[in-house]
Amino acid sequence: MKEITVPIQYLIETPVSALYTNTTSGFDTPRQQTAGRVQVVKIVYIAAPTSNSVGVGATTRSSAKQYETKMFFENVDYLGDGDDQANATSFQTPDGQEYFVQPISYTGQDVKVRCSCLDFYYRFSVWNNNDGSLLGDPPDPYVKKTDSPPINPKRIPGLCKHLIALTDRLRQERFLR
């Protein structure tokens, strides 16, 4: 039987902080600065305590256009009624149920992300898929039609300005710490 080896980078996702740093240090475009002009209009939390995961969906707005921006966290520690909730973070699902979880680590917690904007689709989705941090189905293979330079020459996973804005908001709300 032939042994198959898979590089470790394809077996685990990437922490939010690494995607954020890749984006802010790897590109000339100041996404972090333009993210400040993105409005996070609505956040919806989807709790999945039986699978120890949380989905965060947001409607974001920039330049009068709306985008669906999503993050998915696994290995989340949900707290029960008897657990110490003093240092916990909480969120409410659309049905009004409140959940308490250990704060999600900004630097250590792996994440899967997706945004409906074209910048994310063309610049990051392929590379996020390669490292396991893309939420949902991978994009169709890109067929280059011009001689222009690649949009992501370093081939690094990252975040669009809408995902940066959502990350900043989740940190402000202390959901990410």
Question: Can you annotate each of these PLM segments?
Answer:
Residues 1-177:
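Long, low-complexity, compositionally biased intrinsically disordered regions
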